Amino acid sequence: MRLKTLASLPLFALLTSCYYLQSTSIPIKTIHYTQSAEQADKRERQLMVLLPGIGDRAGVFDKHGVIDAIHTTHPNMDVIAVDAHFKYYEARTIIERLRQDIIKPAIDAGYSAIYLGGTSLGGFGSLLYLKQYPDDINKIFILAPYLGDAQDYNYLIENTAAPEVPRDVNLWPWLIQLPDDVKNKIYIAYGTNDKFAVPNGLLAKQLPPEHTVTQTGKHNWKTWAQLWPELLARQ
């Protein structure tokens, strides 16, 4: 039986996504999911770290069946869902918190592989982490990731010059020059009617074809819940 442990996540915070009520707590709040109550040898286990989209909280992945989908296809994989809400991105502390509170301890614990997964803003966060610490992460699985504003990528569509001074959160100068070893770590899925379908498609062109999953759908959990199992099966 799967065991779920709630790590310092108040019920009130779980029930609200109002930005003004969110705080950037240290350490960042998490929910841990393991397959049994017995302490497993971490050297034989893998870890998936999940980042929610804007307006969602850590429990959203369990609610929509993602945790069960992961454990069905990867029975030796532990999962940590992170309460990585918008305030961490606004404060530019999301990468520091992920590394100090989750990834570095997981590396020290001896996990055989560490993956990141995220929806929407969480996909953006996964890419930010991979860019800064590529050696920490084996693969990332991103669903309909936010990839910046149109001003960041329109030049790729219009075949014009790139912006002279990219914004500090603009990933496109990196995304269009990904080294092969990084390309092979990225898996993306999105609905063809998603509001981010255009930039998602631009990223998909940078990746091996088998790393992309699409289906009819919009930017919502109805679509993502169907895409998650197929994306996980691609690795």
Model-derived segments and their meaning:
Residues 16-17:
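C-terminal motif of bacterial Sec signal peptides marking the signal peptidase cleavage site
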Residues 89-108:
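Alpha/beta-hydrolase active-site loop
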Residues 54, 90-92, 189, 197-235:
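C-terminal catalytic histidine-bearing segment of alpha/beta-hydrolase fold enzymes
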Residues 157-208:
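The feature captures the conserved acid-bearing segment of alpha/beta-hydrolase catalytic domains
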Residues 117-126:
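Gly/Ala-rich beta-loop-alpha elbow adjacent to hydrolase catalytic centers
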Residues 141-150:
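Active-site nucleophile loop of the alpha/beta-hydrolase fold
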Residues 23-71:
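Short, surface-exposed "cap/lid" segments of acyl-processing enzymes
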Residues 71-88:
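Conserved alpha/beta-hydrolase
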